[in-house]
């Protein structure tokens, strides 16, 4: 495995360069949003954005139905990762340099992750790290059935997400009736472990959360999200994908909510973001 110096952030620099080229080529469509947190919520553990649809071309956004990762657009290409994965830009980024790690051949998004996936994630993270998230199926917020992981780069010392403190304190949370706690498992995480250890740890957490086991189940028996940082990992068991006009993927549980013209703002203001998340587990 190629070991990269984290301080170099070669993948991140390539992502920024390809972002510039892709925007010039009109191959990238950054989603324009406005932060409206203060209008709806008083705390700082969520960031609420409203999607600006004034330049939102639905035909372009949803595009053709063929697999966009097979083949992927060459102008979005960042680097090859091992023998089985490719690093590319997200065509519809939520932040600058929004990175996707995809399998270079078809693998289902809703299947069990394997050791090669964890080896590839680890290789990228040794160079460029941040908030990783994975959505296992449409119910968990996945937009494509081809296996892909997403990375939002974070600088050294930067908080990974608004809900980080909540995740770190979840295991000491005393409310045994908490619907979120019953459907989320969180643990300390060490990216320096051997990839086989990361893979086995993932399977262990899935089993504890009631997602099944690859020995007896062909695929996880519930949709789920994964959040990964340099310090912790969380897996969220999912039940719904669209409620009160909101669609939630892994980023929603990390504390990033997106409001669209269909979202029930009054519900969000009355009950708050955490109550909204409970509807999705």
Residue ranges and their predicted role:
Residues 105-127:
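Intrinsically disordered, low-complexity linker/loop segments enriched in Gly/Pro
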Residues 4-113, 155-281:
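Active-site microenvironments that recognize anionic phosphate/pyrophosphate groups
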Residues 86-91, 121, 132-141:
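Catalytic micro-motifs at enzyme active sites that drive phosphoryl/nucleotidyl and oxygen chemistry
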Residues 83-85, 97-98, 128-134, 145-149:
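Generic beta-strand structural signal
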Residues 103, 137-161:
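Histidine-centered divalent-metal-coordination microenvironment in nucleic-acid enzymes
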Residues 126-129, 154:
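Hydrophobic/aromatic-lined pockets within catalytic cores
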Residues 130-143, 147, 214-229:
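A short glycine-rich, hydrophobically flanked beta-strand micro-motif that places a catalytic Asp/Glu
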């Amino acid at each position: 495995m190629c070991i990269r110096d984290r301080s170099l952030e070669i993948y991140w620099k390539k992502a920024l360069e390809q972002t510039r080229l892709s925007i010039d080529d009109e191959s990238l469509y950054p989603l324009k949003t406005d932060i409206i947190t203060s209008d709806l919520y008083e705390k700082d553990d969520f960031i609420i954005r409203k999607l600006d649809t004034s330049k939102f071309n639905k035909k372009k956004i949803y595009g053709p139905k063929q697999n966009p990762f097979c083949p992927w657009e060459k102008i979005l290409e960042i680097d090859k990762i091992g023998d089985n994965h490719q690093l590319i830009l997200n065509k519809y980024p939520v932040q600058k340099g929004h990175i996707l790690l995809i399998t270079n051949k078809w693998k289902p998004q809703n299947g069990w992750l394997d050791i090669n996936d964890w080896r590839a994630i680890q290789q990228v993270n040794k160079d460029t790290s941040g908030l990783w998230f994975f959505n296992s199926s449409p119910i968990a917020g996945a937009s494509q059935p081809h296996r892909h992981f997403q990375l939002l780069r974070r600088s050294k010392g930067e908080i990974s997400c608004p809900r980080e403190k909540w995740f770190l304190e979840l295991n000491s949370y005393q409310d045994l009736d908490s619907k979120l706690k019953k459907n989320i498992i969180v643990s300390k995480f060490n990216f320096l472990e051997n990839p086989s250890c990361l893979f086995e740890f993932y399977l262990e957490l899935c089993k504890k959360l009631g997602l099944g086991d690859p020995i007896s189940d062909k695929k996880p028996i519930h949709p789920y999200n994964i959040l990964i940082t340099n310090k912790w990992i969380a897996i969220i068991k999912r039940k719904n994908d669209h409620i009160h006009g909101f669609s939630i993927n892994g980023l929603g549980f990390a504390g990033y909510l997106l409001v669209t013209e269909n979202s029930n703002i009054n519900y969000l203001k009355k009950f708050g973001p955490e109550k909204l998340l409970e509807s999705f587990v």
